Regions:
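N-terminal binding-site loop/beta-alpha segment at the start of enzyme catalytic domains
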Residues: 1-76
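Glycine-rich phosphate-binding "P-loop"
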Residues: 20-34, 150-155, 236-247
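A short, structured active-site edge motif that brings together acidic residues
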Residues: 74-87, 117-118, 177
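Alpha-helix-loop-beta-strand connector modules within alpha/beta enzyme cores
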Residues: 61, 65-81, 133-144
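Conserved, mostly hydrophobic/aromatic
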Residues: 6, 18, 44, 52, ...
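Glycine/proline-rich, positively charged
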Residues: 26-28, 32, 42, 89-181, ...
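Short, well-ordered coil/turn segments that N-cap beta-strands
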Residues: 11-16, 47-51, 72-76, 109-113, ...
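Structured C-terminal cap/extension of enzyme domains
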Residues: 45, 171, 189-313
């Protein structure tokens, strides 16, 4: 699998990273249990995936830790996230420290490679910089984390307002950014900055419910059109993707979604969350295929040019 360097971190990450969140949360979100989650993590490592992402709020750190405690820590990159507020207030320094230390215990490790502040809202950004970030910087000096990241709440911040502000600063080594076939606004709003500043980019939301199958996409777009949130021309996306599949240039809508993100300049690693070993293996096959045909992109992308209100959720 292709390896990309995460910005200036010098971390060499596989094109596909295993995501411990999303709808499935390694299957625990579908009540498949922790043993199944552990099988998915092990299958990812066995397939050569070398970046694993989770968060204290996902309840998948323990399953991941149960697997990686038996793996050479230098063979993979471990990423987790801090929930920066509790009961509507910013966590004080003692609670920020306690959050990371609890994550380390669940993950059975003495450090994480990337520690993100999770889902930062624009209105909270300055307070996070003033009060939360210094705690992470101190813990980095203690060796508990190597790099500091920030993620956006893409489901509600589809215009990347928080990360557009954060990208101007020099604080962040890695960013987790929402990007997919329905909303590729990060291309113009963020990637030129992250590339210039050497900020590593993890892609989330490559595939969400809307992009799983033709029926989901048709229903998703129709509801947005009926509500006046989208132009009716966006409905042409479904037949265009169907045509791509029927011509044998793509096996599924999901494959198209992964390939779209995999070949986007500015994206270093695409996160894939699943609770199925079989789905994981298929995603690994799909993401390593060539870029989508230029002729298809020339017809598809204008449908969503300027669209910033969708996450695909």
């Amino acid at each position: 699998m292709r390896l990309n360097t995460l910005g200036k971190t010098n971390i060499r990450a596989t094109l596909l990273g295993l995501g411990g969140g999303g709808f499935s949360r390694l299957g625990t979100g579908q009540n498949k249990g922790e043993p199944n989650a552990e099988r998915v993590v092990q299958a990812a490592l066995d397939a050569g995936v070398n970046l694993i992402d989770t968060a204290e709020g996902y309840d998948t750190e323990t399953a991941i830790g149960n697997v990686i405690q038996n793996v050479d820590r230098t063979k993979f990159t471990l990423s987790t996230k801090l929930t920066y507020k509790k009961d509507g207030r910013l966590k004080p320094p003692t609670e920020v420290r306690a959050s990371l230390e609890a994550s380390l215990r669940r993950l059975h490790t003495d450090h994480v490679d990337i520690y993100h502040i999770h889902g930062v809202k624009l209105d909270d950004y300055q307070a996070v910089v003033d009060h939360t970030l210094p705690v992470l910087q101190r813990m980095r000096a203690e060796g508990k984390l190597r790099f500091i990241g920030i993620t956006e709440g893409f489901a509600s911040d589809t215009e990347h307002r928080a990360l557009q502000r954060a990208a101007q600063d020099g604080y962040w080594d890695v960013m987790m950014i929402g990007f997919n076939l329905l909303n590729f606004s990060a291309r113009d709003r963020l990637f030129h900055i992250t590339r210039a500043k050497g900020i590593g980019v993890l892609c989330m939301f490559a595939v969400r419910q809307a992009l799983i199958c033709p029926q989901n996409l048709q229903s998703f777009l129709q509801k947005k059109v009926d509500a006046g949130e989208l132009d009716a021309q966006t409905l042409h996306a479904v037949p265009l993707l169907r045509e791509l599949v029927e011509r044998g240039e793509c096996s599924s809508f999901t494959e198209a979604a992964y390939r779209f993100c995999a070949h986007e300049p500015g994206i270093d690693c695409v996160l894939s969350g699943t609770g199925s070993v079989e789905h994981l293996r298929q995603n690994l096959i799909d993401i390593q295929k060539p870029a989508l045909p230029a002729e298809f992109l020339a017809r598809f992308e204008p449908l969503f040019a300027g669209v910033t209100a969708l996450s695909g959720q």
